[in-house]
Amino acid sequence: MQANGMIFWDWNGTLMDDVDFTHSCLNWMLETHGYPQRYDLAAYREIFGFPIEEYYIRAGFNFAKHPYAELAERFMEHYNAGVDACFPSAHAAETLAELSRRGWRQSVLSASRRDYLIEQVAARGLQGYFTELLGLADIYGVSKVQ
């Protein structure tokens, strides 16, 4: 086994298949807060991005009516209540295991709050593949690099 370097993985939507769930969370947030628009998956993918605050603007949230911090907290409450139904992406575990066997060091770089990231990785039994789990100190998703 020869170490070949470091691989940085994304977590949400890459190693963990939560795209359909986060898409449904957006539509739930819009409905809950009285907004008429809903997004199909393709439109969701078009507007999603970082910073999350700008994504919320693209989705149509009015921060004068619903402040971003409150929306972010509400989203995380809803997301955390249902995320256990999300599983690793197809072949993620096998790929991580094979790369580990070949000597690659692997880390996760995520815009998720770090404690949530650690819980989600552990709940899926993948923590042993990573040398580091790099997440944010808060839930506001400004950038993966802070």
Spans of features found by a protein language model:
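Active-site neighborhood of HAD-like aspartate-dependent phosphohydrolases
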Residues: 1-43
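Substrate-recognition "cap/lid" segment bordering the active-site pocket of phosphatases
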Residues: 114-146
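Metal-dependent phosphoesterase signature
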Residues: 57-94
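Alpha-helix N-cap/helix-start and coil->helix boundary motif
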Residues: 23, 49, 53, 93, ...
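Alpha-helical substrate-recognition element adjacent to the catalytic core
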Residues: 24, 32-61, 65
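Short, acidic loop-to-helix structural element flanking the phosphoryl-transfer center
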Residues: 80-108, 114-118
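Conserved donor sugar-nucleotide recognition element shared by glycan-biosynthetic enzymes
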Residues: 22, 52, 88, 141-145
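Hydrophobic packing residues within well-ordered alpha-helices of enzyme cores
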Residues: 26, 56, 92, 117-121, ...
